[in-house]
């Protein structure tokens, strides 16, 4: 076991504060900065695995700029020390490789930054924190996550779950990377024992789920977390990607993509004015749900030209499998049918078992039907079932424990089958992937701040999923407390925002609405300067109002435009109730 020499580290500290990047970015300096084995419980460092090299001509796109507009889109040269370290878990014989990027000493602002990944991939880029003067890291999670996605390694073989990879992907790898990274950062820059290292997390989609896993399980490590559209409630969320296909097979109708698009666009047009301004954005999907009947669209004409489209094949979209795919759609000309509207209504209504008990929530009205898009069969000249691989692969690998990339058929699959799959996965992965622990006392008590947001028209992860978790936290942490007091106390450390018209972790091509672009600036101001947000700063990037700044309403207040330039944040109890769900199809609480 290595011995940690305080005198040597103190000397390194003084040198690091005054030295250039070239002076501190050496293998010996990094090895001296490693915590001694036994200091971090369950982590034994491998000093011989350390690498270090100074990087001067690399640019950073900045934080999570490519995932939902967070962190900006700057492309600036940030010199940094590119470090690789490795560790093992005592008794396991494994090896976890972690990359860290340390800004040159003159740029360091006593910050550590963690970026989330997406789909079944953890982030492999360690440079996201550079623009904030933050050290940052990325981990291979012990299963070479730099080269393989988690779904590729979840099974050793049929019937045999790789639990080590599962727990590492679920939360452990990022928690260990941050625990080690904060200690290493402190020593690398020679900070005094009482010096603060502000630690931030930022991510969307599964990156949002990963962030929630850190807040739930490593709350005292983080000062601020920004989580967008979290893919938590994993069992329900992933199986829900098969729900739209089961609706179509149950109703025996596969709407042409153009018919589905017409239903969405006509709904947007009809509900746009309900929020008080006609701008192409439905800021109040709750009012749309309460006051608009999709049946009014029956008989409306639609037309779409023939097209060939390509999917990149990543993330939690319809096509999860790696590798791009190409599909052909013929020209489509027709009118919206009652069968098409029936499919749309059933999807928006959400999954119920055959006893009529609700099992899960669904996408907000005006969301695209991403999981419902059928395939064109040239041989039969008809639209046919296309099972989304995001949901299908989860069922085969995570529920059935078969090493298959998708379901081959939905024969004999009913709504009850979906509920059974959800229940099986919920029980199996409750302490790993589910990520729904509602007691955030540790995070709150440590002074942590949570900024949680979700695109209201997200077609992948329902916006109501985030609303449900927010309400779960409120009810668990403030039992017996009045509504006004619990809300006031909660908003001091946990704020949730719905983004009008927004899609999954980004702006929506169908609705030219606002989107947040400087969440990290807001979070840093909140954490380091005590400036608590009241509303969320967003910018409209397209359409007639491009460039407009909108300060969004904090949940549970809802926007209502007074005129074309000003909106109020109002309390609308009936609308808020439309976002509330219980799930009696399950016999245990679903947070």
Regions found by a protein language model. Give the residues of each.
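Fungal secretory targeting signals
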Residues: 1-21
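Serine-hydrolase-like catalytic core of hydrolytic proteins
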Residues: 3, 80, 84-277, 289-293, ...
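Catalytic-loop region of hydrolases
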Residues: 14-111, 123-124, 291-405, 516, ...
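Active-site rim elements
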Residues: 167-170, 254-258, 329-332, 456-457, ...
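Acidic/polar loop patches that form or flank catalytic/metal-binding clefts of enzymes
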Residues: 186, 194, 278-284, 353-360, ...
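Short, well-ordered loop/turn and helix-capping segments at boundaries between secondary-structure elements
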Residues: 231, 244, 248, 273, ...
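Acidic, glycine-anchored loop motifs typical of Ca2+
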Residues: 276-284, 301, 306
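Histidine-bearing beta->alpha loop at or near hydrolase active sites
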Residues: 485, 490-510, 542-545
């Amino acid at each position: 076991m290595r011995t940690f020499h305080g005198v040597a580290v103190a000397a390194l500290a003084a040198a690091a504060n005054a030295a250039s990047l070239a002076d501190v970015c050496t293998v010996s300096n990094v090895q001296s900065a490693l915590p001694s084995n036994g200091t971090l419980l369950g982590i034994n460092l491998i000093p011989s695995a350390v690498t270090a090299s100074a990087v001067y001509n690399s640019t950073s796109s900045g934080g999570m700029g490519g995932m939902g507009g967070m962190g900006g889109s700057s492309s600036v040269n940030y010199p940094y020390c590119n470090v690789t370290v490795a560790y093992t878990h005592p008794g396991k014989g494994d090896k976890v490789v972690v990359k860290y990027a340390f800004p040159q000493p003159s740029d360091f602002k006593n910050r550590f930054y963690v970026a989330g990944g997406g789909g079944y991939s953890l982030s492999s880029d360690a440079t996201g924190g550079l623009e904030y003067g933050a050290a940052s890291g990325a981990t291979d999670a012990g299963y070479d996550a730099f080269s393989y996605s988690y779904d590729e390694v979840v099974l050793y073989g049929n019937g045999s779950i790789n639990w080590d990879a599962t727990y590492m992907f679920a939360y452990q790898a990022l928690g260990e990377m941050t625990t080690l990274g904060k200690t290493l950062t402190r020593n690398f820059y020679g900070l005094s024992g009482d010096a603060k290292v502000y630690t931030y997390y930022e991510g969307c989609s599964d990156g949002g789920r990963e962030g929630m896993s850190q807040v739930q399980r490593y709350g005292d490590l983080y000062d601020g977390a920004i989580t967008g559209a979290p893919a938590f409630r994993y069992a329900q969320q992933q199986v829900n990607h098969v729900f739209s296909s089961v609706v179509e097979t149950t109703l025996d109708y596969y709407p042409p993509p153009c018919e589905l698009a017409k239903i969405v666009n006509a709904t947007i047009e009809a509900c746009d004015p309900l929020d008080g301004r006609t701008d192409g954005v439905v800021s109040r999907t709750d009012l749309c749900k309460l006051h608009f009947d999709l049946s009014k669209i029956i008989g409306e004409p639609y037309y779409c030209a023939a097209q060939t489209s390509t999917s990149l094949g990543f993330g939690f979209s319809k096509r999860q499998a790696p590798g791009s795919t190409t599909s052909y759609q013929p020209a489509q000309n027709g009118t919206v049918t009652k069968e098409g509207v029936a499919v749309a209504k059933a999807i928006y209504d959400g999954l119920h078992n055959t006893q009529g008990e609700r099992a899960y929530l669904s996408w907000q009205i005006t969301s695209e039907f991403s999981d419902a898009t059928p395939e064109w069969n040239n041989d039969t000249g008809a639209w046919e079932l296309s099972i989304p691989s995001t949901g299908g692969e989860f069922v085969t690998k995570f529920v059935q424990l078969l090493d298959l990339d998708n379901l081959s058929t939905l024969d004999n699959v009913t709504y009850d089958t979906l509920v059974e799959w959800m229940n099986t996965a919920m029980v199996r992965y409750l302490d790993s992937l589910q990520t729904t622990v509602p007691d955030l006392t540790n995070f709150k008590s440590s002074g942590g701040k949570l900024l949680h947001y979700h695109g209201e028209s997200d077609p992948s992860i329902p916006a109501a999923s985030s609303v449900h978790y927010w309400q779960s936290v409120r009810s668990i942490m403030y039992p017996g407390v009045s509504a006004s007091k619990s809300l006031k106390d909660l908003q001091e450390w946990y704020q949730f925002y719905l983004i009008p018209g927004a899609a999954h972790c980004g702006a929506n091509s169908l609705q030219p609405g606002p989107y947040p672009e400087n969440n990290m600036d807001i979070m840093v101001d909140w954490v380091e300067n005590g400036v608590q947000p009241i509303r969320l700063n967003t910018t409209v990037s397209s359409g007639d109002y491009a460039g407009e700044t909108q300060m969004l309403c904090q949940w549970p207040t809802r926007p209502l435009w007074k005129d074309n330039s000003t909106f109020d944040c109002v309390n609308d109890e009936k609308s808020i109730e439309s976002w509330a769900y219980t799930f009696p199809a399950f016999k245990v609480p679903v947070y």
